[in-house]
Amino acid sequence: MSSPSWSGAVLALDGTQPLERELVGGKAYSVNQMRRLRLPVPSAFVLATPLCAAYQDNGGELPAGVWDAVLAQLATLEQATGRRFGGPSRPLLVSVRSGAAQSMPGMMDTVLNLGLTPRLRDVLAAESGDAAWAADTWDRFRRGYGEIVLADPDAAPPADPHDQLRGAIGAVFASWRNERVRAYRTRHRLGAGGGTAVTVQAMVFGNRGPGSGTGVLFSRDPSTGEPCLFGEWLPRAQGDDVVSGVATPEPLSTLAERMPGIHAQLVQTARTVEADLRDLADIEFTIDSGHLYVLQSRAGKRSAAAAVRIAVDLAREGLIDPATAVSRVTREQAETLAAAAGVRASVDVVATGLGAGPGITVGLAVSDTERALALAAAGTSVVLVRPTTAPEDVPAMFDSVAVVTDLGGGTSHAALVCREIGLPCVVGCGAGTSQRLDGRTVTVDGTSGRVYAGDATTAGGASSLDPHVEALLELAGLAPGGEILDPGHPLAPFASRGSP
């Protein structure tokens, strides 16, 4: 029997043909869809999800024919950008990104600025007249490639950019089997899954100069559901600086002040993507020398309260029907809202930051992830307190009752994960907060952004329903209060909560 041909599993993301999310993964699907919508998206192609298992089954090598297909797509990127991958002048740099069918923010690996060498760094410096930018871009690539592909941040990347690309593709495929992916898929009952795709995209540079930056925006507030643009950005930075939480970003209001034209484009982009998704849109963007580029989009992770309000508002706006609105709220989210607690007055505030994951809970502050896992396994309610969270912290986050960080913003991966699983989260509390809180019992209010000394909670389960919950029950054809729900219904936790 002849072996299958895999050359057709490397696909252009040019928006000219519809693609299946299961085949190309969520990231590539969004790139292709946004190209179809004529948004400013850098050129890209994808190695489809079946290649992930094929790569593993082939002993960590790409199947026959795949590399030739990759080179053919690289030639298309070169033509689109007017640059040459590994070329002696006007070098093309690319990002190599993961993307499973189900969104798993930050769980798998990404390599940025790929295609650089010390010689090409100098070419970039001469071409741009900005030696500092070229050096920063090289340093970012060298460290990132060493950490992700070579498992040694001090190791030098291969001298040939094509060898760099082979290595990065393999590293992204291999990241499908890492511990944080397993923990995430187990927590969300996603099963084994079909593997990750690999998206190769032409680089744009938020770290280039004063007219550059990077950020994340949501078409609505993912914590409250309020119908207003929410997001953060960092000038002269690349995307990982925002989502990793290693820096505390600025609100979009400062972008509106400095670059009003770019901000206006983002407002329209959010409307366009939300209308296409018919859901809360989470959009990653880069500004390169005054030009806006959209890198990816997806349905945004949201808090329980936001899930209810967004579902109701989208139904009222005619973007979704009542049945879809009801299906957008999970049993776990309903339980979170039904058990909401409060905070007693006159309790000492021991830390203040940005409330990034609504909810109130109490636990023992622990700064070491291994100790946090051990204490949680023994039955202790753990509040994970960290300078910032890395993807490796995800298993400890899942076993904690809240997360508090020194650095980071509301669009960091820590905030996204916490909102998705209903975990109270406060970010950006200031340097030294995690050390200061370690070992103390604290109450975390992820709505207000405050951390209190000791157990400051009051009893949960207030008698009245939030008006958006009442509206959701009405969309479901149910009356608030009364005998309305089968115990197995996702909205059953609201059954004992009536109107005043």
Which residues are covered by each model-predicted region?
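Phosphate-handling DNA/RNA-contact segment within nucleic-acid enzymes
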Residues: 352-383
